[in-house]
Amino acid sequence: MAQEKFSFRKETKLKIKFLILFIFSFNIQSSNLVLDFNNLIVNNFEFTQKTETNSSTTESKGKIFRMENEIKIEITEPSKELYRIIENKIEIYDYDFNQTSIYQIDDNNGHVLDFIINGVKKAVVKDLTNSSFSIKNGDNDILIELNEDNGFSLTYIDNMQFKNIINFQVIK
C-alpha cells in the first residue's frame, strides 16, 4: 500500500512536470512566432489585397514604405492613392479625384493599422499554429499567416462584412 501511494505521487509529479513543460514550450512557440512577425513587420512591402463582396472580388495592389516618423502606403492599382500615417492621424491623397482627407486613428478604425505600425502583443494572440495565429479585431478576428519567403498574409472580415485577404511580400 505504501508502495502504491509512492508510485501514485511519483506519477502525479511526473504528469505535472510534463504539463508545465508543455505549457512552457507552447509559450516559447507563441513568443517565437509573434517575435518573427514583429521582426518581419518593420520591412518595406509590396502587397495585394483581395476583397470578396457579395457578388464579386476586387483586387488592389500597392507598397508600404517605413520611414523614421511615418509610414507611406501607396495604392497603385486599380486607382492611385497615397496614405501617410503620422503619429495618430492618417492623411489620404486620392490622385484620381484630386482630393485630400485627414482622419484621426482611434480604436474604432485602427485595429489593422495598429499592429502594422506597432506589431502584435503576445497577450492578444490566440489559435496559434506553427505558422499562423489570430488576434481580435473588434467583433472579428484577424488571421496572420507567415510564409517561408519573407512574407505574410492577413485574412479578416471588415466592418462591411466583406472578406479581405492581404498578401505582403518584403521588398528586396
Feature-to-residue mapping (PLM):
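Short, solvent-exposed coil/turn segments at beta-strand boundaries
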Residues: 39-42, 65-71, 85-89, 128-130, ...
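Gly/Pro-enriched, hydrophobic low-complexity segments
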Residues: 127-172
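Flexible, surface-exposed loop/linker segments and immediately adjacent secondary-structure boundaries
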Residues: 98-135
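N-terminal leader/targeting segments and the immediate start of mature chains
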Residues: 26-61, 68-69, 170-172
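Short, surface-exposed charged micro-motifs
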Residues: 61-63, 80-82, 141-145
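Bacterial N-terminal signal peptides that target proteins for export
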Residues: 7-18
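An acidic-aromatic
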Residues: 64-112, 159-164
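Sec-dependent N-terminal signal peptides
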Residues: 17-26
